[in-house]
Amino acid sequence: MKGWGWLALLLGALLGTAWARRSQDLHCGACRALVDELEWEIAQVDPKKTIQMGSFRINPDGSQSVVEVPYARSEAHLTELLEEICDRMKEYGEQIDPSTHRKNYVRVVGRNGESSELDLQGIRIDSDISGTLKFACESIVEEYEDELIEFFSREADNVKDKLCSKRTDLCDHALHISHDEL
């Protein structure tokens, strides 16, 4: 009878490890997809477009302390994007990396009517995947909203790895993931 107890314990540990890895793959993939979507949206804004930031109070000398900042990376624009960006997760599918056997999430729909030349072989596309990816994305936005705004308010290189791996620890295997854009 003792053997069954050890077997149950071992089975529980293995299932727990598998679930944790699946959960990490999901959150890592959601973070990386979120970064891709935000970078694309920011790039679509006219770089000449600005927004006034600062105090709209009139100083005693009659002047105002207002500063013009680029709209694309303004806190107002980023906050607006974060409110709706996770809806884009329905445009992603799940792919198992043959070498690592880990799940990756890849865009399966072109942006703004672009035709997709993507080979969809080996990519699972269904409402369960997009629903769980959207939920993971919303959780990330809720938990890391300040970090997302901080990172995207100024241009930076390698945002995916810096944000998803180093800052949030959502990805432990970021250097091994290829995450191609359409």
Swiss-Prot record:
Annotated Saposin B-type domain residues: 24-175
Cell compartment(s), UniProt: Endoplasmic reticulum
Modified positions (Phosphoserine) in chain numbering: 115
Domain of life: Eukaryota
Signal peptide range: 1-20
GO cellular component: endoplasmic reticulum
Main location: endoplasmic reticulum
Disulfide cysteine pairs (residue numbers): 28-171, 31-164, 86-137
Motif Prevents secretion from ER, chain ranges: 179-182
Coiled coil spans: none
Tissue expression profile of the protein: Expressed in different tissues. Highest levels are detected in adult placenta, liver and pancreas.
UniProt keyword list: Disulfide bond, Endoplasmic reticulum, Phosphoprotein, Signal
GO terms of biological process kind: negative regulation of gene expression; regulation of low-density lipoprotein particle clearance
InterPro entries named in the record: CNPY, DUF3456, SaposinB_dom
Pfam families, per database record: DUF3456 (PF11938)
Family: Belongs to the canopy family.
Quaternary structure and interacting proteins, as annotated: Interacts with MYLIP/MIR.
Function of the protein: Positive regulator of neurite outgrowth by stabilizing myosin regulatory light chain (MRLC). It prevents MIR-mediated MRLC ubiquitination and its subsequent proteasomal degradation.
Protein name: Protein canopy homolog 2
The organism of origin for this protein: Homo sapiens (Human)
